[in-house]
Amino acid sequence: MTLSNNIKNKKDNWNYIWKKKSNQIKAKNIKDLLFLNGWDANLSKFSVKSWKNFVNYFISKNKINKSHTILEIGCGAGAFLLPFYKKNIKCYGIDNITNFIKICKNFMPKAKFYTAEANNLKIVKKIKFDFIFCHSIFQYFPSKKYANQVLKEVLKFKTKKNKIFILDIPDYKKKKNYISQLKRQIGKRKYKEKYSKNMHQFYNYEYFVKIVKKNNYKIEKLTKNLLNKKTSRYRFNVIIY
């Protein structure tokens, strides 16, 4: 999970939380990777089968095969990349949590993983990617300024043929409903303890449209609930092509 180094030493931020999470268990299977990636909360729980179906949707829909090279920005413990890797697809992953990168390398020794920030992708700048994924990371960015930097950096890799997927983006238009649901689910006290200093970033679809079209690329909104989890109704996905 990729966040800004500017805040990584403060305990009350997502970066600290993910560092702590990365050391909670010794991962032995994809279920453990999902736990380390934070998919254990009541609102975001789902089965391993649902997860595999979710990832395989992108593989089959886009006819991704072993001739392709993919990059995941904010790869966490590697749960999203693992199904690609098992199909002999060339995988690259970036995250700024060192322990997550170690876990990824352990599960996918032939893939390439790097410790880096999402807004500075120089380490892979010479590589041409057929597909780039940012799954469920934009909510953890410290500011819209940082998100702008990430989008600018990611779009440097855009070509006429490749695609960029930004997935599981919190919808600003549904923010109030999401917070209400969260409070009902975990209680107002726990909500305040957990989110008073670490609230997610929310985005309008128009935010992405403006930046993408400014760079003369096309963008598509995908609202279909591809993953069977409760938070999906408050999220959207974008495809840049």
Task: Annotate each predicted stretch with a short phrase.
Residues 141-142, 158-160:
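Helix-to-beta-strand junctions that scaffold the AdoMet/dcAdoMet cofactor pocket
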Residues 84, 153-154:
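Class I S-adenosylmethionine-dependent transferase superfamily signal
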Residues 141-153:
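A short, conserved alpha-helix within the catalytic core of class I
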Residues 2-62, 73-89, 95-110, 115-121, ...:
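Class I (Rossmann-like) S-adenosyl-L-methionine-dependent methyltransferase catalytic domain
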Residues 133:
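A conserved beta-strand element that flanks and buttresses the S-adenosyl-L-methionine
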Residues 121-127:
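Short amphipathic alpha-helix with an adjacent loop that forms part of the alpha/beta core around
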Residues 63-68:
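Short helix-loop-beta connector
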Residues 136-140:
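Short catalytic micro-motifs in class I SAM-dependent methyltransferases
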